[in-house]
Amino acid sequence: MKHKFRSCAALLMALCMVFSLAACGQNGSTGSDTKQTGKNSSEPTPEFAYTASFTKLRENSKDNSQPQTVTADGFYSVGNEKVGDNTPEGVTPDYEGQYDVYAPYITFTDFSGKVTKLESYVPVEEDQSNADKRDYAGSHSIAGVAVNDDGSLTIIENVYLSWSDAPADVKSDSDEYYNYYQSENRYYLRVLDKTGAEVSSAKLDADTSSDDFYVSQFVLDEAGNALVMSSIALTAFAPDGSLAYAIPVDGYIYSIATLRDGRIGVLAMDMSSHDFALNIVDSKAGVFDSTSYTMPFDAYNLISGGGDYDLYYTSGVNFYGYSLETETAEKLFSWISCDVDSNELALVNVSDDGTISGFTGGYDDKAETYSLDYVTVAKVPYDSVPQKISLSMAAMYVDNSTQKAVIDFNRSNDKYRIDLVDYSEYNTEDDYTAGLTKLNTEIMAGNMPDILAIDTRTPYRQYAAKGLLEDLYPYIDADSELDRSDYFPNVFAALEVNGGLYTACAGFGILSAVGAASIVGDTPGWTYDEYYEALAKMPEGCEGFDYGYDRNTLLTLCLALDMDDYMDWSTGECRFDSEDFVKLLEFANQNNKDFDYENAEHTEEDTAANRIREGKQMLTMANFYSADFMYNNFEQTFGAPVTIKGFPTMHGVGNMITTQSSYAMSSTCQYKDAAWQFLRTFLTEDYQKDVFYLPTNMKVFEKQLADSMVVEYEKDPNGNYMLDENGERIPVSKGMISDGVNTYTIYATTQEQADQLRQAIADTTKLMNYDMSIVNIVTEQAAAYFSGQKSAEEVAKLIQSKANIYINEQR
C-alpha cells in the first residue's frame, strides 16, 4: 500500500486536541470596563453579546445514543442495544460478547429531557440465505435520520453481513480459512411515522459492494430525495430507492448542508485545480449549478443556514456566518467565550430566528457512563449580561486541554474570566504562520496578553529575556500545595531563563534518535565527528535517518536542538559564524538532496524496520510522549541491543524536550493572583494524573508508569483466564497505532521500555527551541550552501550578520 508523505514542516511539527449563563461579545471579546493589560483600553463596548444556556439532559447515564436531527420540540437520537445471543450450541466464546447480537433503536427527547423510545421501529429484516454458513454474522446500523415536512422520518439503514464459505475440513484458525471470507453491505432507504412504524422501505439502487460507496452524511433535497455524501461521490435516491441522480466529483467532498433558501450546498476540493469551493446542487437537473462560491480554507464542516446567513461553520474555537452574496465569512463569537467546549460539540443547528443550538457531552471511561447537555446560543444586548474582570489570553491552535481548562476556570470563578484569542484564526491558506507573526508583532509592540500559551514555536526565551514574562518560582514557593522539588529538575532547568521559571508546564515529550549499540556505542550523546565514524561502519549508501529526513528537516531539527548555543536573547550575542555551526550546516547537507514531499509515496519498503534490516538506515526517530503508550520495541526493530543516542550535538546528549500544556503570565498583568490561580492548575497532581503526555510531576509520572506496566489478561464469560496455543495467558491489548503503513498492537509497558523511558528523560536537558524568526533566517541563507552557490563558512557569516541585526533590534 502506498501513502502520500507529509511535508517537511508538517513532519517536524508532528514530532514536536440545570442552566448556566456565559457571554461573549459580538467582536469576540467579552469586554469589561476594568482596564486590562494586553488590551486597548479605548476599545468600544460591544452592542450585543452571545449568551449560552445549558440544559442537562443526561448525567451518569448508560444511554449511548447520539443526537441525529433537531425539531422545534426536541431531537431524535440513534443508539445500539443488545437484543440477543447467537452463541452456537457447544461453543465457548473466545471473549465476552463475541456472539452478542445488537440492533439499533431510535428515541425522541424533548427539551425538558423526557425520552420516548419509538417502540414501533423494527430494524430491516436480514437476508438469511447464508445464515447456515460458518461464522455467519449480521449487524445493523442507522447511518442518518432526517425529518420530512409532514413530521415523518427518513432514515438510511445499513445491514452488514459476513460469513465464510470454507469447507468443513478447513480449520478456522488456519490462514487458508480467511481466503473464503465473504461479506455483503446493503443500504435501505426507509420512511417511518412518528411512532417508528414503517411507511415504506427500499434497498438503495447502488453498488454497495464498492469501497467508494458509503454513507458519510445525507440530507433531503427540495424534491425529497436523499442526497448521500461520501468523500468522493454525491448520489441522490428517490423515496423508492431508485437512483434520482449522481454528481461526479473529481476531488474530495468535505461537507454538505442545507442553505437558508432550502438548496443544498456542497463543500469540495477540486483535485485538478485545487480550488476549495462551495457548489450548489440543482436537484431538478441533477448537476451542480454553474455558479460556485469561494470559501475560507478552514471551513471544513458546514452548518445549515438560518437567521442572517446562508450557512455557518466552526473553525477552531470560533463560529462564523457566511454570505453567498458577498462570498465572505463573519466571525460571530468564540465558543470558549460562551463557555462551550467545541471539542465536545455535536449537531450544531441554526433556526430561522438565528438561535444557535447544539449538544455537548462525553463519556466517563471510569464510571462507564454518558452525559449530554443541550446548549443554545442567542444574541442579546451586551448590557444585559453580568460582567467579570477580564484576563486576556493568547494561544496558537487551542488544544483540548487548554480549552477545557479555560472553560472550567470561567465557570467556577465568579469574579474573573479568561478571554482567550486563538491566533490561528489569522492564518491564511498561503501563510500558516500569519497568526504567530501577528501575535509576536503585537507583543513586541507592547500589547502583551495576561496569559500566554507556550509551544515550541513561541519565542519564549526572547519574551523572558525582555522582561515580558513573570518568574513563577516565587509563586510556586509560596504555594502550600506545590513544591518545586516534586518536578523533574532537568525539565524545569531546560525551561529556565537566567535562573527564573517563566512557564507553568504540565507535561512534556522527549524527541531523540535510536541506533544499534554495536554501531553507535552504548553511551548516549555524540558529536558530529562521532556520528560520521558510526555511519562509516554501515553499508555504502546507508542514510543516517528515517525516510524523508532531508537536509532541510535535519537543519531545522538540529537548529531547534542547539538554538541556545548560537544566540542569547539576554545579551544579544550570536555565534552563527562559529566552527560548531558550520559543522551543523555540513551535517544537514550530508545527503546533498531535497525530498520531494509533493510526489513521494510511503510504502512498506520505506518503513524504518525494513530500511534498518536492509542496511539503508542507521538510526530511527524515538518520540517518548506517554508513560502509558509505549509502542516502540527498538530491540526488535534493530535485531540487537540499542542505545537512545540522540541527535549529534557539540555538547551533552542530543535529546529535546517538547512542552505540553505550558502557560506563562505577563509581568505587567494587573491581576496576577487571579492569573496564578489558573496557571497553578497545570502543576497540580490532580490535573497531571489525567494527562496524555509525560507529566512534569515525578510522583505522578511514576504512578502512571507503574499503572502502565500492569498486565491484564483476557477472560472468558465465566471469569476464567483464556490461554493461547502454548497454554499461556493472553495479554489484553491497550490499543493500536499506525506508522502510516503498518499497524502495531500495544500492550502493557515492559520493564525494559520503562528503563529506556527513565533513561531518556534523565539524559535530556535541552528544550526544543523552534524560534521561527531565526529559523527562517537560517533556512533562507542555507539555501545558497545547499545549492552549491556558497560555502558553509560563507553562509554562516551571512546568517551571523542577519541574525545579529535582528536579535539586537528585537531586544
Ranges and model annotations:
Residues 20-23:
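C-terminal motif of bacterial Sec signal peptides marking the signal peptidase cleavage site
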Residues 25-99, 111-113, 145, 159, ...:
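Conserved N-terminal structural module of periplasmic/extracytoplasmic solute-binding proteins
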Residues 193, 224, 495-602, 667-673, ...:
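Helix-loop-helix "hinge/cap" segment bordering the ligand-binding cleft or interdomain interface
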Residues 457-510, 526-530, 641-648:
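Hinge/lid segment of periplasmic solute-binding proteins
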Residues 473-486, 564-586, 636, 646-656, ...:
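Short, solvent-exposed loop/beta-turn-alpha elements that line the ligand-binding surface or hinge
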Residues 540, 681-710:
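Periplasmic-binding protein-like
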Residues 586, 590-677, 698:
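Extracytoplasmic/periplasmic substrate-binding proteins
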Residues 725-803:
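C-terminal capping/gating helix-and-loop segments adjacent to ligand/active sites or protein-protein/ligand interfaces
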